[in-house]
């Protein structure tokens, strides 16, 4: 059966996450339903990242197996026609070898978290950023973030119910971009790793926000990391500011 990779964009707000749910809307379920309108099913797709409720994506990657050979451009267009009016889009499709696996072939995942500092409620970005009503110190947050880059035991920064076999991960990059706007300052956290633990990004950003607000010192981030204790983590920030922005493979399937 021919295998296709799909690059997917979605607004996570209306969905109970990526993974198919029995009684709730999911991104996986929406795409599998659309595939069923192109070819008889059942269809099961696999994704590089199983994003949680409310988390968005601009560069999710999944793969599917189909019966017939499809022109990738036409496949993307046909799926988009059947996904309407849901906030899900197939940005690109590509024919890939049968050994390609969207999850297990991935060598890198990239996330963005958008944190907006302003007193007024957000309007145009509602549901797409995490807003805090107080100013933040970006240099303090960068100093705290520096303690987290590299290979560490991230027990403190993973969900209590995380099912990963090991809490040890290598965080390849964690950078902070400051975007000054007329109506507030946005802080964009860019994170890159081969893989992440459940709630790792939101735990890290929630903790760094406390540093930026002056409630924590940068050195307390190191102390929390070295505690290897979930109770030492700062607050877990809400999901709406988080985006899966890209997935890397040894060879780009969409090139």
UniProtKB/Swiss-Prot annotation:
Keyword Isomerase attributed: yes
Reactions this protein catalyses: uridine(38/39/40) in tRNA = pseudouridine(38/39/40) in tRNA
EC nos: 5.4.99.12
UniProt entry keywords in alphabetical sequence: Isomerase, tRNA processing
Binding annotation for substrate: 111
EC top class named in words: isomerase
Active site positions: 52 (nucleophile)
GO terms under biological process: tRNA pseudouridine synthesis
Gene Ontology molecular function, alphabetical: RNA binding; tRNA pseudouridine(38-40) synthase activity
Entry similarity comment: Belongs to the tRNA pseudouridine synthase TruA family.
Family matches, as NCBIfam families: hisT_truA
PANTHER family: PSEUDOURIDYLATE SYNTHASE, TRNA PSEUDOURIDINE SYNTHASE-LIKE 1
Subunit structure: Homodimer.
Function comment: Formation of pseudouridine at positions 38, 39 and 40 in the anticodon stem and loop of transfer RNAs.
Protein name: tRNA pseudouridine synthase A
